[in-house]
Curated annotation (Swiss-Prot):
Redox regulated molecular chaperone. Protects both thermally unfolding and oxidatively damaged proteins from irreversible aggregation. Plays an important role in the bacterial defense system toward oxidative stress. It is found in: Cytoplasm. Pfam families: HSP33. Keywords: Chaperone, Cytoplasm, Disulfide bond, Redox-active center, Zinc. It comes from Pseudomonas putida (strain ATCC 47054 / DSM 6125 / CFBP 8728 / NCIMB 11950 / KT2440). The keyword Methyltransferase does not apply. This is 33 kDa chaperonin. It comes from the Bacteria. Belongs to the HSP33 family.
Length: 299
């Protein structure tokens, strides 16, 4: 099989003779789409790309119908990183940061001190799940590894990389006992696949997925599953922005229009699209007319 072209996808794989599964993610266009909408400093670009890769890996590894949201928060120079990805594999991301407090080469602990990571699964049906842990690691790869070892009680490792406008990720997870019933054999097997993954060099991350996996595990029987494409898509809309105004109540919404000089601007923090509502738009919203009569929408 030849390598897949540069595109956006996740791909699961399994070791036929080991109790280990894996997942690979490649994000080119969707990561570029996020970066094109904001002038993020390099350290912010890297962390946001890594968080996008982690989110896509989790969507690929979990079975649910709905939305997965990852938020990293802190009181530091980067107070928020946020990525959303749907079960249809539509992804978007954003960051908030203090531009004058982000030196080149800053570490995660410097950029997000005392931070925490929140994972939310918002299903189409059923109850919402949310879990929060400290950002306990030298980098996001370590943070996610620690999160899942604690929550799932299974050996799990993440490797995340973002460079040159491309984001990549690798997930390895030990499966429940099946092919290898012996404890020592299972542990040796796990350490084997992890040790090989640790040999990945920075310049190798942007190579084709099959080339890379073959280089790492050519002595193992590795079975690749079909790729699952991803794409950037922002779920914002004029209707949602109008609903946000309606939630304020008619009196406060009209007062806000007056305070803003006759036109309220609502910005999407993900894609930078701007929605404008004047007094007649707000009156229509509360008259039950919806948002059909539009003031401007701008990028």
């Amino acid at each position: 099989m030849s390598d897949l072209p540069d595109t956006d996808f996740t791909q699961r794989f399994i070791f036929d003779e080991r109790d280990v599964r894996g997942e690979w993610v490649s994000l080119d266009d969707s990561y570029a789409a996020v970066l094109a909408r904001h002038e993020y400093p390099q350290p912010v670009q890297v962390l946001l790309g890594e968080l996008m890769a982690a989110t896509a890996l989790l969507v690929g590894a979990m079975k649910f119908d709905g939305l997965l949201i990852l938020q990293a928060r802190s009181a530091g120079p980067i107070p928020l990183l946020m990525v959303e990805c749907s079960s249809e594999r539509e992804i978007r991301g954003m960051a908030r940061y203090e531009a004058d407090q982000i030196p080149a080469g800053a570490t995660l602990s410097q950029l997000m001190p005392d931070g925490h990571l929140t994972l939310t699964i918002d299903p189409v049906k059923g109850q919402r799940y949310q879990g929060t842990v400290d950002l306990d690691g030298a980098n996001l790869s370590e943070c996610f590894t620690n999160y899942f070892v604690q929550s799932q009680q299974l050996n799990t490792r993440f490797w995340l990389n973002a460079q040159g406008g491309k984001a990549r990720g690798l997930l390895l997870q030990q499966l429940p006992r099946d092919r290898q019933p012996d404890d020592e054999e299972r542990e040796d097997s796990w350490q084997h696949v992890v040790a090989l993954a640790k040999t990945l060099k920075p310049e190798e991350w942007t190579e084709g997925n099959e080339t890379l996996l073959h280089r790492l595990y050519h002595e193992d029987a590795v079975r690749l599953f079909d790729i699952q494409p991803l794409r950037f898509n922002c779920s914002c809309s004029r209707e949602r922005s109008g609903n946000a105004l309606v939630s304020l109540g008619e009196h406060d919404a009209k007062a806000l229009v007056d305070e803003c000089g006759g036109t309220v601007e609502i910005d999407c923090q993900f894609c930078n699209e701007r929605y404008f509502f004047d007094a007649s738009d707000v009156a229509q919203l509360f008259a039950g007319g919806g948002t059909d009569v539009a003031s401007e929408t701008r990028h």
